[in-house]
């Protein structure tokens, strides 16, 4: 069954001509990491299967481990390199609560500010200039004071991308859900390979010792059989 990349706008397929291109399955054993993979791919209502893969071109170089003969992803690797990183091309459901609060506060400002500037002759004047020049009634000033503190939050929410790029995390961060989490996996891999190599040497030595013991036991049995034969032949020769 040919392998093809599941990322949006990616047509890479498995081919023996491109040996440097590798394909990696989704981390179903880690639900939080799997959710980030699915969000970054940028496909609406996408549900990966057990054999769904993504090619290595969507990962940064630091996402791969330096040990082993083939490309292995680190335990916290997340695909972040895509061709649709333009926010106008990103399609996903608006589930960011910060963006919803930003949209609500911006709509509230649009409702309050026209009421404050209703008595002005030029309604198309700049918003900041109108706020400085107008002498607002007490109730209107109260509305503006309630709305103005939310302006930084609304600006931050509008400036924040609502696509999958806003939910990405840098691959350098190490997830530490527990205080006893293993962080230095490279050194542990190196120790594991050294231990396996030493174990192989000891296994070969054990096989050699067993072979020597078998030879010695066979010689001992042959020697005992020869002595028994001589003991039986001795009385017959004397008679």
From Swiss-Prot:
Modified residues (Phosphoserine): 122
Keyword Zinc: yes
Molecular function in Gene Ontology: DNA binding; zinc ion binding
Locus of motif HCFC1-binding motif (HBM): 177-180
Tissue-specific expression: Highly expressed in heart, skeletal muscle and placenta. Weaker expression in brain, kidney and liver.
Keyword Transcription carried by entry: no
Job description of the protein: Component of a THAP1/THAP3-HCFC1-OGT complex that is required for the regulation of the transcriptional activity of RRM1.
The name this protein goes by in its record: THAP domain-containing protein 3
Protein's organism: Homo sapiens
Lineage, opening ranks: Eukaryota, Metazoa, Chordata, Craniata, Vertebrata
Gene name of the encoded protein: THAP3
């Amino acid at each position: 069954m040919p392998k093809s990349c599941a990322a949006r706008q990616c047509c890479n397929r498995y081919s023996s001509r491109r040996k440097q291109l590798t394909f990696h399955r989704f981390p179903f054993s880690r639900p939080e990491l799997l959710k980030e993979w699915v969000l970054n791919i940028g496909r609406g209502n996408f549900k990966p299967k057990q054999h769904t893969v993504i090619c290595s071109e969507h990962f940064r170089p630091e996402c791969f481990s330096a040990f082993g003969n083939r490309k292995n992803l680190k335990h916290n690797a997340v695909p972040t390199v895509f061709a649709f990183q333009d926010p106008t091309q990103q399609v996903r459901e608006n589930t960011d609560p910060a963006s919803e609060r930003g949209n609500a506060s911006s709509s509230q400002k649009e409702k309050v500010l026209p009421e404050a500037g209703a008595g002005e002759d030029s309604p198309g004047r700049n918003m900041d200039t109108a706020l400085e020049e107008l002498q607002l009634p007490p109730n209107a000033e109260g509305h503006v004071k309630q709305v103005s503190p939310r302006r930084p939050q609304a600006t931050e929410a509008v400036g924040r991308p609502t696509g999958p790029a806003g939910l990405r995390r840098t691959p350098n961060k190490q997830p530490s859900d527990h205080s006893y989490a293993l962080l230095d996996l490279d050194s542990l891999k190196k120790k594991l390979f050294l231990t396996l190599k030493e174990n192989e040497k000891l296994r070969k030595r054990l096989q050699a010792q067993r072979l020597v013991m078998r030879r010695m036991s066979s010689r001992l049995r042959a020697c005992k059989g020869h002595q028994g034969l001589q003991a039986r032949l001795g009385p017959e020769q004397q008679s």
